[in-house]
Amino acid sequence: MQDISNHTPMIQQYLKIKSQYQDILLFYRMGDFYELFFDDAKKAAELLDITLTARGKSNGESIPMAGVPYHAAEAYIAKIVKKGLSIAICEQTGDPNTSKGPVERQVTRIITPATVSEEAFLDSNQDSILVSIFEKNNKYYLAYTSYTQGKIYLVKTLTSLNELKNTVLKLSPQEIITNSRELAQQNPFKKPIKALEEWYYSNFEAKKYINDSLDTNIANNILNLYKNDQLTTIGSILSYLTNILKDTPRHITDISYEQEQDTLNIDINSRINLELDNSSKSSLLSIIGKCKTSLGSRLLKRYFSNPTRNLNILATRHNIINSLVENQHFLKIQDVLSYISDIERIISRVALGTVKPKDLVALRDSLEQLPILKKLLSEKNTPEITNINNRIHQLDELVTLLDKAIIENPPATIRDGGVIKEGFDKELDELKSIKDNSYDFLIKFEELQKQKTGISTLKVGYNRVHGYYIELSKQHADKIPTEYIRRQTLKASERYITEELKNFEDKILSSKEKALAREKLIYETLLKKVIEYYKQIQETAASIAEIDVLANFAERAIKLKLSQPKFNNLAKLELKEVRHLAIEHNIDEPFIPNDTLLSKDTNTLQIITGPNMGGKSTYMRQVAQLIFLAYIGSFVPASYADICDIDTIYTRIGASDDISSGRSTFMVEMTETAYILNNASAKSLVIMDEIGRGTSTFDGLALAKACAEKFAQIGAFTLFATHYFELTELAKQYPNVCNIHFEAKEYKDNIYFMHKAVTGAAKKSYGIQVAKLAGISQDVLESAKQNLYNLEKKQHLAESTQIQAQFELEPTTQNPLQQKLDAIDINTITPLEALNILFELKKR
């Protein structure tokens, strides 16, 4: 630590505290402000758009200072946290009246992006996720907690950085902690990340924190169930939270292991390509997610993050949806749900000591809706709905307690009192009555003094500095009674006090202090009573979230004309009249649905051809989105859907330069393709859109053909869109490959897209017609037509002969070139060898 002896005692104190929190902003309490100094002040001034001033000097230079009012600090802190930064709150803990030198101060709380519970700091529809990554021997152990949910989840051991990146980005955490300084420096996740000291990832410390933080039975179960490296990862979260909270995180009540084999896996690129859960209005989440509560919205996002392949869970969800659809029963349930607040986060705030009086009113009002909700659920007497209903606890005693204790519109905090309802506590009422009756005393006292002095202009008043006083004009100085004691002199008047008024003042001020202290004690006792219902409220919140999501699915099923999917074990995917929800939602004309059939017995690979804008990409995306919806338990946009077991969805759609990594469009495309080829299996759904277009025609064709052949050999269900019409010949070589194309009709030099998938290969690409639709000028179009004519006339024979030779087309005449082609066995040569032969023939 630097020499601080040349600073003032106050700055010395600040620097000592700051040295323990070097990487985060220190909010240092001074009176009614939180002040920041040095670099913290500069950063805060820029982030918060507040004035940067100066205080004193350091080494001859002014010390930068910026501050925010204490009463408005929450809004400023929220801005900082939402930018991914952390804050240490340093409060005055000593008594200014007894302190020698600076008042004692301590950091009472640390606020980080993932460890906030206040409503102002949180997105109500987004889980606040803290991820811990323990790297050891080239393996990654990962655990995460949804802070206000009170649970820790352990993920399977990850063996590659790419696998780790996909897992982390799928969780979309607000904050990451790790033992790896290298990982923190690289930060491939582009999320707030910090490398912690080694002791956070000590196995000994981990077991200690597990024992200290969790219920004894849960702790013993965890210690027996998981291996040391897994325990270290769990313990790192508990130790980090303990340090942040300055207390044991008692709100963590559950730890569970996520079973990957029960999940439909979708990597981050595929999620982006399919527009599953981004913030755009055209994302699948924005169309499907119409939950009535924040609880339901967050649970739906978890469904989107982890689609389940557990058929029992999916059957339960589908059965509940069917029950709620009957007579549109979901409408009544959604009406009740709309009155329920975020009780999960409210009870977490109670446990964490950050709850506000208005939260308790919201909790009471929400709990009052539970009897109505339970009655509505009981009307659907199915085992699945009954199971949910049994986990919703009707907490009438707590409702009564909160109703009696808290006024209807309480102030923002308990700091100045005024929260507890009259009649709840006799002692508090008596203390308040002294203040309430003070007005009558002052009126009578003032009238008595007027009579006694004969001065009609005499006034009795009060201010916070001097207290109660009697005010008289200076012209009446000769009439002042001897018992009047001068308290304050003004320009035109004098203020006095009497022993009687002083006694009254002491009584009033004493009663105020006692009333406030009493009210705070009652409030703390009330919170202790509320926390006794923690587990019941958490379980109730989880059940409300579940019924909210399923009622939402029921409403969406009716509104969007969705149907219940079936599941089979026949390796067959049969879909009829499939629609793309986002496109259907955003166009005025009727959407053209399409059928899809993929089966190991007929075809696993579809080569899809047709013009741009014809519907190829939409067709592929809608199949992937339908599979995804089926595996989150929703109904699907099709008239019929029979789905086999799909464990992963891969997509290669579109590309752009990755400038930050120095990778070209083609390199990005090939990297993503390599990942899919290396990981796809017979249980994968693969979407490939225009592979090979980022390089020369021959290279692109060779690569596209090789990739398509590989997918055919793997047996992955593959939708392969291409402009290389030569690939349609693969259907003659592989029994599990078929061709489909999207039709277009020409009329008077115009093109009309049918958007209908038809068996067979396309005959034409319609590129010039599409260019016309895009607004290319007529002179350019005419030039393009002439160029096309010349190319077809001059190069058709040579190029078509070379390319078609790869697909074993019959020769039309016998010459040396054709004899050479006849001698080639294309079933045994590689694409590279084929290209070499083509170049050799071209030289001839």
Curated annotation (Swiss-Prot):
Record GO cellular component, one term: cytosol
Residues binding ATP, per UniProt: G610, P611, N612, M613, G614, G615, K616, S617
This protein's UniProt keywords: ATP-binding, DNA damage, DNA repair, DNA-binding, Nucleotide-binding
A Pfam family it matches: MutS_I
A GO biological process held by the record: mismatch repair
PROSITE patterns documented for this protein: DNA_MISMATCH_REPAIR_2
Domain of life: Bacteria
UniProt GO molecular function: ATP binding; ATP-dependent DNA damage sensor activity; damaged DNA binding; mismatched DNA binding
InterPro entries membership: DNA_mismatch_repair_MutS (IPR005748), DNA_mismatch_repair_MutS-lik_N (IPR007695), DNA_mismatch_repair_MutS/MSH (IPR017261), DNA_mismatch_repair_MutS_C (IPR000432), DNA_mismatch_repair_MutS_clamp (IPR007861), DNA_mismatch_repair_MutS_core (IPR007696), DNA_mismatch_repair_MutS_N (IPR016151), DNA_mismatch_repair_MutS_sf (IPR036187)
Free-text function comment from the UniProt entry: This protein is involved in the repair of mismatches in DNA. It is possible that it carries out the mismatch recognition step. This protein has a weak ATPase activity.
Entry's family note: Belongs to the DNA mismatch repair MutS family.
Name of the featured protein: DNA mismatch repair protein MutS
Organism whose genome encodes this protein: Francisella tularensis subsp. novicida (strain U112)
